[in-house]
Amino acid sequence: MTIQANVPTGDETSDEASRQTSNEASSEILETARQQVLENGVGLTQAQLEEFLRLPDEALPAALQLAHEVRLKHCGEDVEVEGIISIKTGGCPEDCHFCSQSGLFDSPVRGVWLDIPELVKAAKETAATGATEFCIVAAVRCPDIKLMNQIKFAIDRINEAVDINIACSLGMLTQRQVDQLAEWGVHRYNHNLETARSYFPEVVTTHSYEERLETCNMVKAAGMELCCGALIGMGETLEQRAELAAQLAALEPHEVPLNFLNPRPGTPLENQGIMDGKDALRAIAAFRLAMPRTVLRYAGGRELTLGDLGTREGLLGGINAVIVGNYLTTLGRPATADLSLLVELNMPIKELQKTL
């Protein structure tokens, strides 16, 4: 009886060689990140981020573990909790293709103003969750005198009613408006880059990337903390995702909220597919390794993209802040669900620290 040996075919040999090369590359970028970011506190470069984002699925657990170690070493174990509310919803003149608040699209969102007593009530409810930050948001290109006056009145009433840091997100600002917000005690200002410079014209045409940067730089110069984030999953390439992380790292914001596209009816991106959960987790780890000391916050779209299990994995993969409750035009997880998860993971909520 003749026994035939299983001789690998040419294709099998090629596949095995490819897997070995991929494993070696994965080990190399992870070891580089461990030495450069974890040990020395220096973020990955754009080229290194591209390599990291190409890690295969089997390397994802190790990547998330490394990002978690970086977060613990360079940021500590505390998790910052924030609530947000819109003082003006809808009717925005800008054409951000992902946003249902644009007045240029056939979106179901309609213009609504929130009165000051409701704003104060929301601030109290946010503080009751243990949150240290309350962000007032308006869907505008830039605030007019009426809105600025309302913001000043709202800040005064909130400060009288509850002890919480106040942040604002009011679009692009003039130097005078930046100075006013700083004088009124605004702790942090949010103005997102959203996507990479090279992809920005594909998702926004009514203003430029440079205009966004100008506001960000003025905010930093005025002494307010800059919150400047990303919206990923809009059709950008892996390379553009790395580009965005590197551009944010160069800007050095205090906080980076990570949003994942939740396609909204009536917007140009309504038919864009949902980002793969593993790609989202890879991005979370990559942004942490690009910015080892930055507050990296879970923001919109995580419920749809990651679900409950993915939310947990992200908190163990570089995230150290969350927005609790609902977002501007979409529903979030109940605050109790996120707070219970933090307790389960033994992650203490950061205590309130008034900085301004």
UniProtKB/Swiss-Prot annotation:
Disulfide bonds: none annotated. It comes from the Bacteria. Keywords: 2Fe-2S, 4Fe-4S, Biotin biosynthesis, Iron, Iron-sulfur, Metal-binding, S-adenosyl-L-methionine, Transferase. Binds 1 [4Fe-4S] cluster. The cluster is coordinated with 3 cysteines and an exchangeable S-adenosyl-L-methionine. One of its GO terms (biological process) is biotin biosynthetic process. Residues 1-28 are annotated as: Disordered. [4Fe-4S] cluster binds at C92, C96, C99. [2Fe-2S] cluster binds at C135, C168, C227, R297. Catalyzes the conversion of dethiobiotin (DTB) to biotin by the insertion of a sulfur atom into dethiobiotin via a radical-based mechanism. Homodimer. This is Biotin synthase. It comes from Arthrobacter sp. (strain FB24).
